[in-house]
A protein has these predicted regions:
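An amphipathic alpha-helix adjacent to DNA-recognition modules
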Residues: 12-17, 52-75
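Amphipathic alpha-helical interaction segments
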Residues: 14, 89, 93, 109-116, ...
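Helix-turn-helix
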Residues: 22, 29-57, 61
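Short alpha-helix boundary/capping elements
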Residues: 44, 56, 118-123, 167-172, ...
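Hydrophobic/aromatic residues within well-ordered alpha-helical segments
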Residues: 55, 62, 66, 70, ...
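Hydrophobic alpha-helical connector segments
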Residues: 75-110
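Short secondary-structure transition hinges
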Residues: 96-139
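C-terminal peripheral helix-coil segments that are non-catalytic and often amphipathic
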Residues: 134-238
């Protein structure tokens, strides 16, 4: 059963906050529990085991810290939709709340931590251990799957993960990109419109995709070597 952040003792909350920052910065395996406890200002070296049972329990608590706020915003977007929503509207309902309800500093911490979770399997990912908190996300995913009845569910979920990855990376890169000397993204709105459209574009790819990597393997060989390609414009070897 999931547990809200405010239900933890004060010391446990300090550990959760420190863990989000340190896991995001160093990775789930790049920082020791002892270092986290020290960073949280706690003196008991067994504090993680005391409050969370294990490292996995701590990761779960970090994930659940911001989940209720983000999920409530997702539910509000779902409530405002009609029954004929587009994939763009569904993706927006899933991603936009992150930048709408979390201040810049907190959403950067959130994004860095969430990026560390992306490689985890379903059995390891904390999302699947707190589905009672994540009903809006589950509903959004269900509707996304319904939009692509001819695609296998694993293909759709892979594309969703790629879209989420793009958006989270956009949060991580915002400060750097907005400071580029070209000033290509003069306003925050322009930047986020761009990031969102990049994320959305993964759903427009055909399946099966056009062959590229497999096509190279099947090219005819001359004397045991593949023929060199020439640049059409200059004739130079590529």
């Amino acid at each position: 059963m999931s547990k809200r952040f405010e239900e933890y003792a004060r010391g446990a909350r300090a550990i959760i906050v420190a863990s989000e920052r340190l896991f995001g910065q160093y990775g789930l395996d790049g920082i020791s529990l002892r270092q986290i406890v020290v960073a949280a200002g706690q003196v008991n070296p067994s504090a993680v085991q005391h409050h969370f049972g294990s490292k996995r329990g701590l990761i779960q608590a970090v994930y659940e810290m911001r989940t209720p706020l983000v999920e409530a915003a997702r539910q509000a977007k779902l409530d405002s939709m009609n029954k004929r929503e587009t994939i763009e509207e569904l993706l927006a309902a899933h991603l936009e709340p992150i930048i709408e309800v979390l201040p810049k500093a907190k959403r950067l911490l959130y994004a860095r931590f969430m990026m560390r979770l992306l490689p985890l399997s379903d059995a390891e990912h904390p999302h699947f251990s707190c589905l009672d908190m994540c009903a809006p996300s589950v509903e959004i995913m269900s509707r996304m799957l319904a939009h692509f009845p001819k695609l296998a569910p694993d293909i759709v979920t892979t594309r969703v993960r790629m879209a989420v990855c793009v958006f989270l990376q956009g949060i991580c890169d915002e400060r750097r990109v907005r400071r580029l000397v070209s000033h290509a993204y003069r306003t925050e709105d322009i930047y986020w419109d761009e990031i969102f459209q990049i994320a959305l574009s993964v759903f427009s790819n055909p399946y099966p995709p056009p062959r590229r990597f497999g096509a190279r393997a099947s090219e005819p060989r001359r004397n045991g070597k593949r023929p060199l390609k020439r640049n059409r414009r200059s004739g130079a070897r590529a």
